[in-house]
Amino acid sequence: MALFSKKDKYIRITPNNSLKSSVSRNIPEVPDELFAKCPACKHMIYQKDLGPAKICPTCSYNFRISAQERLTLTVDEGSFQELFTDIETKDPLRFPGYQAKLQKARQATGLHEAVLTGTALVKGQRLALAIMDSHFIMASMGTVVGEKITRLFELAINERLPVIIFTASGGARMQEGIMSLMQMAKVSAAVKRHSNAGLFYLTILTDPTTGGVTASFAMEGDMIIAEPQSLVGFAGRRVIETTVRENLPDDFQKAEFLKEHGFVDAIVKRTDLRDRIAHLVAFHGGVS
């Protein structure tokens, strides 16, 4: 008989000797949405400290917000009248999974499409308004987005209204192929007709504004303003660096970089946008 018995390599668990936690199972759970991590300064922030404008109290980073949140921050209470809600995509390519993706985005955002369009008052100034929402398939521009914005410009021409667009997009919607790319030219033509009518068009670039939206109506405003630190560009940074074979500046494609190089007229804090919009619309002969 051996002096020392060999210990088992593993602990055997049976119904009679199952491990029991010494910690109470009634552990309070912290809700997932109680805190938010700032993408810029990496601090964990209590959601209530962000305020309605969703601005980081540590570094002033502007969190991405929904179209409904931006609407609340911008227009006079109860003045918004939504338009063009009956437009549906025909899904021309019968792209696999596209309809399911649309339905999921609608349930998640409460929007029918990636842009909210209508008329509203901002400090008593009546205007045509479009707000793109990056939470809806990254606010990609498909046929419905292009059609809604085009119709908004046509309405603005008929009613002699200024147009204000909050842009945010990942680019053209690949699930709709060439039909998506055609929206760039269609909306740009509507912008030109609105301009020929002597009406004011203001674009507000928000994070992120990229791809076909940047290459068309986002940069065609009579005035172009941007939120601080917004990503604005056409192609991605890595694509450009690979093409030109150069390292780009750290702030490349940021709103501040664009302003420095003359592509943006002004950078305005989110909390100041409502006042700035009202001032610019009134200055350009606004409608009350």
From Swiss-Prot:
Single GO BP term: fatty acid biosynthetic process
Listed GO CC annotations: acetyl-CoA carboxylase complex
Molecular function (Gene Ontology), one example: carboxyl- or carbamoyltransferase activity
One Pfam family cited in the UniProt record for this chain: Carboxyl_trans
Catalytic activity: N(6)-carboxybiotinyl-L-lysyl-[protein] + acetyl-CoA = N(6)-biotinyl-L-lysyl-[protein] + malonyl-CoA
Enzyme Commission code(s) on record: 2.1.3.15
Tagged with keyword rRNA processing: no
Top-rank taxon, per record: Bacteria
Keyword Cell division: no
Cellular compartment(s): Cytoplasm
Zinc finger extent (C4-type): 38-59
Cofactors that this protein relies on: Zn(2+)
Cofactor binding notes: Binds 1 zinc ion per subunit.
PROSITE patterns cross-referenced by the UniProt entry: COA_CT_NTER
Pathway stated in the Swiss-Prot or TrEMBL entry: Lipid metabolism; malonyl-CoA biosynthesis; malonyl-CoA from acetyl-CoA: step 1/1
All copies of domain CoA carboxyltransferase N-terminal, residue ranges: 34-288
Keyword terms of this UniProt record: ATP-binding, Cytoplasm, Fatty acid biosynthesis, Fatty acid metabolism, Lipid biosynthesis, Lipid metabolism, Metal-binding, Nucleotide-binding, Transferase, Zinc, Zinc-finger
Binding site for Zn(2+): 38, 41, 56, 59
Residues annotated as transmembrane: none
Chief subcellular location: cytoplasm
Function of the molecule: Component of the acetyl coenzyme A carboxylase (ACC) complex. Biotin carboxylase (BC) catalyzes the carboxylation of biotin on its carrier protein (BCCP) and then the CO(2) group is transferred by the transcarboxylase to acetyl-CoA to form malonyl-CoA.
Oligomer status and interactors: Acetyl-CoA carboxylase is a heterohexamer composed of biotin carboxyl carrier protein (AccB), biotin carboxylase (AccC) and two subunits each of ACCase subunit alpha (AccA) and ACCase subunit beta (AccD).
Name assigned to this protein: Acetyl-coenzyme A carboxylase carboxyl transferase subunit beta
